[in-house]
């Protein structure tokens, strides 16, 4: 496994530096998603000496036996994706002949053959798929009122929309969507892109909510992201996710989507032998002004030993999306936190652990975590996956061949539910920024009845009174509460990135003892990047160990909030690469004051003797200079908003 290396989340100037450096060779490291030797695809990144139009790039591609698949997002016409017509999709050696041919053109600055890597769908697959034919309801066409329950035949099985205790579930442990629907909010004028293995846009429960203009197939390079049918139904994943968001209401077919009047776009990008940086980048930057939300139920391999994340072009596309998408309000990227269970940590997944994405975990219908849930300090909130008592009490949604299923599961099922809730919030207030959505998530998510089945992680209160859990983030999404608060929301103040300090003198981590490092900071006080109220915190760390999986890391804020930023991963037997500038992220100090002493603790958790070194640590604080909720008026003195706002006001008076 290559070294786990990323600096991509540090600060805008680093991202700009990488953007200028281009997207050719990966993010400096990991390849951890690959098994075995390196793989090279038939895709090439071609960087021109000047910005060129698509016609010019097409002529260059054609001259050397390539197809031009178009410009890269954010490259201003300097970079294009070429695919060779005869090279195999994957080979173990670079094709130097084709690289040299491209570089021989006087307008080409460089050409880089793209490495391939694995990305996996996050969803359990039942041994026998529970696929059902369509069921039609006698009430179709009666014009049901919005305050009545949906008549869709699978709605009674959609316990995550309305939990009445079905199959041993906890009554009212659900997304509280009916409270949003009752306000007339159903997702109108919002489009969610399902980045997956395709969407069956001819499904009768989806076809009227399908946004063809915002859809594309990056696996086959055409505008028709239809799934490739296989005998094992594996390519049903995207269609199932789409139904969770926007399945139509009261049409007698399957169930109903969380935001049933919203639109879905299909972005087919998972169905090829190997992923490339260019496919990911173009998917995440596709039609950013037509698409509001991108939902991703996939990521690096959840094997408990992979450390991997987005490469350069992909990271650039995400950053451009949050900065420029939706006409400057920012696209919302929703990510499934991972299905590696207690043997994995989603802070080792650079997609889920990114501050630009919203990482969503899952709970089952009685409130406990699913056995496949990963824990990490970067998870912001949770929704729901399969039920506890009955393996068939999964998520009821659309499936291939115009059919329905009740067995969709994994954190794959959780992310689209969150996307649907965010679509409701965006209808309620179309001016919400990507950061507003994150703040609303923190303030309106509920602890409810969520608990850790193995009693490892308890609910803890941070320094400004916000409860969080290492598994569930700030709780389960509450659609009704989010819509209500969205209507009165005022956008949060500008966000700043403060490089708060660094330690670069290596020190040994001794078995049986914790190593403590401290950084005292004024959080850039008096500068243009002053941070007084936290959002995300990153500990950018380099370390090595005789067995990386036995290393644990903790970060404690000046207000005393302790985040486990890396837990033990029993399957990770790496002893060579360790971590190189890996940005471990925590949301647990949200709203806190960053001034003071931050403590990093490193220790081994193993019955065997281990040794290693903490090589360097940089602390990066992200947040606002001004109090984020100063213009809002809480509806209840017991709400999270009221609690945090009072904490901020009390601090200001001292």
Swiss-Prot record:
It is found in: Secreted. Coiled coil: none annotated. The active site is at 196 (charge relay system), 237 (charge relay system), 412 (charge relay system). InterPro entries: Galactose-bd-like_sf, Kexin/furin, P_dom, Peptidase_S8/S53_dom, Peptidase_S8/S53_dom_sf, Peptidase_S8_Asp-AS, Peptidase_S8_His-AS, Peptidase_S8_Ser-AS. Residues 22-121 form a propeptide. Residues 158-483 form the Peptidase S8 domain. It comes from the Eukaryota. Residues 491-627 form the P/Homo B domain. It holds the Pfam family Peptidase_S8. Disruption phenotype: RNAi-mediated knockdown in Akh-producing cells of the corpora cardiaca results in a significant decrease in combined glucose and trehalose levels. RNAi-mediated knockdown results in defective muscle patterning. RNAi-mediated knockdown results in a reduction in the pale ommatidia subtype. Expressed in the central nervous system (CNS) and midgut endocrine cells of third instar larva (at protein level). In the CNS, expressed in the CA-LP1 and CA-LP2 neurons which innervate the corpus allatum, and in the CC-MS2 neurons which innervate the corpora cardiaca of the ring gland. Also expressed in the CC-MS1, SP3, Tv and Va neurons. Expressed in Akh-producing cells of the corpora cardiaca. In the embryo, restricted to the final stages of embryogenesis where expression is found in anterior sensory structures and in only 168 cells in the brain and ventral nerve cord. Changing residue 367 to V: In amonG367V: Partial embryonic lethality and defective larval growth with no pupariation or survival to adulthood. GO terms for molecular function: peptidase activity; serine hydrolase activity; serine-type endopeptidase activity. One of its GO terms (cellular component) is neuron projection. It catalyses: Release of protein hormones and neuropeptides from their precursors, generally by hydrolysis of -Lys-Arg-|- bonds. Keywords: Cleavage on pair of basic residues, Disulfide bond, Glycoprotein, Hydrolase, Protease, Secreted, Serine protease, Signal, Zymogen. Changing residue 254 to Y: In amonC254Y: Partial embryonic lethality and defective larval growth with no pupariation or survival to adulthood. Residues 1-21 form the signal peptide. Disulfide bonds join 254-404, 346-376, 498-524. Belongs to the peptidase S8 family. Furin subfamily. This is Neuroendocrine convertase 2. The gene is amon.
